[in-house]
Every structure is written in structure tokens, then in C-alpha cells.
Amino acid sequence: MIKARFKKRLLGSRGAFDLNINLEIKEAEVVALLGESGAGKSTILRILAGLEAVDSGYIEVNHSVWLDTQKKIFLKPQQRKIGFVFQDYTLFPHLNVYQNIAFAHPKDKNKIHKVLGLMRLENLSQQKILKLSGGQAQRVALARALIAAKNLLLLDEPLNALDNALKNEVQQGLLDFIKRENLSVLLVSHNPNEITKLAQTSLFLNNGVIDPNQENLPFLNCLLIKPLFEDENYCHYEVIPQTISLPKDCLNPTFKLDFS
């Protein structure tokens, strides 16, 4: 169980605002954190990882206190044993795929090989990072995060470089791993299908706080778009309360919805 309450003053594109967060994540639960760009979602991940300071606050993970500003407690990032997938991956370019994944726990070879298989990286284990595609590098970053995570997994747009077929495989493997390892997960993503597939709970960050009236927000209604089925020529999507059909050669449809 993750319990976090903290405050931090941020400077965004629209000026300064206060981040005032009260968050709980259960074991083996994936929580999606939604919100506009610049709302502070990535900052929250970095605070939980110990990579950014807060003005005041408290973080507890499985009854262990990671942060308490009143008691001047601060657990260093390397002591938190979390997995973190950054948007820029932050891999070691001079190491190969296996060495990057094994960096946190080099002796746990059985787990390393399982994660290599989970991320479809078996045939790339000796490849240097600089020779990988964007999607391959992203899978390496995710695999390394899974090896490192003991309690908490932080995912910042973790699958946005993958094609749809591979993404579906990786998503299911990721869910199985999270359940098996009892990880608490905080996911930041702008992909509605990804959120629907991975997350049990969705929270909306609005004006520096997690909005208590999420069900009334137009942004969340975008999650009601989901693929239904395909036939010979068309892909069919459900957009509550109606169904629309698009030509199958429309590979990445963009929906403009009016909720007024």
C-alpha cells in the first residue's frame, strides 16, 4: 500500500500553481493518473521516486516511511527499490540490453531471463543500446524497471513507441507480472486504450489536486472510445452512447468530441 500526501509549488505554462496531492495505491493495483500537459503528472512520479523535493509532505510504502518533512525523514532514491520508466528511457548506451536490465540486480538471472521473454527481447540481449529502435529501447527500459521494482512501479508513457500488435502482448505480460509481484503501479498515459487495458482506477489531476468529481470531467469521457470489432473493410468503435464505423485503412483515427 502506497500512501502519499505532499505539497509543492510549481511553475507551469500558465503561471505558478500549488500541487496538493493525497494519493493511495493498493498492492497489485494499477492507478492511471490523467490530466492535461503541464498539470504536474510527471512531477508526482519524480517526487515518489525521490528525485524531486516537496515543500511539505509524507510518503509511506508498506508501513515504511520514505518521506516525512516534519520529522526530516528522506529515503534516498536508490534505497526505495522502485522501478521507473522515464519518457526518455535513461538507458546506459555503453552497455548491452542484458546489462542494462540486470543493472539493479545482476545476480537474479532467472528473473532477468523471464523479463527478457516478457518484453520479447530474448534475441536482442547482446545488442548495444545505440543500435536499438525506439520501441526496442522502450521495452528495455520497461524490463529494467520490472527488475528493479520491489514495491512500486512508476510508468511515464511506457508503451507509446510500440506498435499495436506488440503493445497488446507486452500489456498482458506486464499485468501478469504486476499481479505476481504484488506491485503498486502509478501510470501516466494519454492513450485511452492503454489506460482501459492496464488500470483498475483512473484519477484526474486538475488545478494541482486530484479532482473528486472525475466522472463529470470531459477528459475522462474520452476513455469511452474503444475498439469493438473489425470486418472486411471497416473498424468499428464504440463512442458512448453510439457506435461509429471507419474505413480499415484509417489506422490512427482522431476523434473530436463535443460534450456540451
Question: What positions do the PLM features span?
Answer:
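Conserved ABC ATPase signature
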Residues: 128-132, 136-138
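ABC ATPase NBD coupling module
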Residues: 66-84
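Conserved H-loop
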Residues: 182-188
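Catalytic Walker B motif of ABC-type/P-loop ATPase nucleotide-binding domains
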Residues: 153-157
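Hydrophobic anchor residue at the start of the ABC signature
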Residues: 142
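Conserved ABC ATPase "signature" region
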Residues: 64-69, 109-125, 176
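A short, proline-enriched helix->beta-strand linker immediately N-terminal to the Walker B motif
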Residues: 147-151
